[in-house]
């Protein structure tokens, strides 16, 4: 069995599929290998005609996912969150899957993992779940598509608070602003998640696939002009070429607070 296969497991109960992240040692960091396993698992369940897919971590985990594997971020002036970045591939795969994907969330959700949850069609969270987006704390230039995905899931004031401050947001507040659909006691998380999955699976899969694609296309129907896109990309290039970007990654590995100089 390959490492990718051990990092991600797949189960199926009738027309409901389950994908479990199993890299507890690295707190389910979104490494290239883990994401490859998730993408392949979605494809396998799609081929098996699953009508709903539950994406989860190990039962009782304290961290649903710690976000990007910082060790894989480039340090040579290359865009760390380009179009072909594994996280971007995973988000697009979830969005393109005709079966609704439900994030079953317990524990902390960090960095890019927040976008993974928000890219799912539904999120059911335990009362003790928390969400934090931390690129500003590390000097990492977040991707413009990723920011747009966040804005589709939550109101702009909260998106700014999460991006600018990097503070944790609890499950109840996340529910109030639309990041998660349901908040339940920890002991009821699995029951409520699979109840929702079965309700979806009982409906017409063709209609649901159509509706999911319609929502995806319409929610992305505000294109940027080429000039605006290039201007934003220029700002991002300035960040990942900066001393602050190098300092953020260095501070992470040295387990200290970064000393950003704005240059």
Regions picked out by a protein language model, each given a short descriptive name:
Residues 1-58, 92:
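Conserved CoA-thioester-binding segment of acyl-CoA-metabolizing enzymes
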Residues 1-5, 250-263:
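Terminal low-complexity tails and localization/encapsulation signals of metabolic enzymes
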Residues 124-129, 180-230, 259-263:
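C-terminal long alpha-helix characteristic of the crotonase
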Residues 47-48, 57-93, 109, 139, ...:
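Glycine- (often His-adjacent) and acidic-residue-rich active-site loop
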Residues 147-157:
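Hydrophobic, secondary-structure "cap" segments at the distal end of domains
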Residues 122, 161, 165-167, 173, ...:
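Well-ordered beta-strand positions
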Residues 62, 92-142, 168:
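Glycine-rich beta-to-alpha active-site loop
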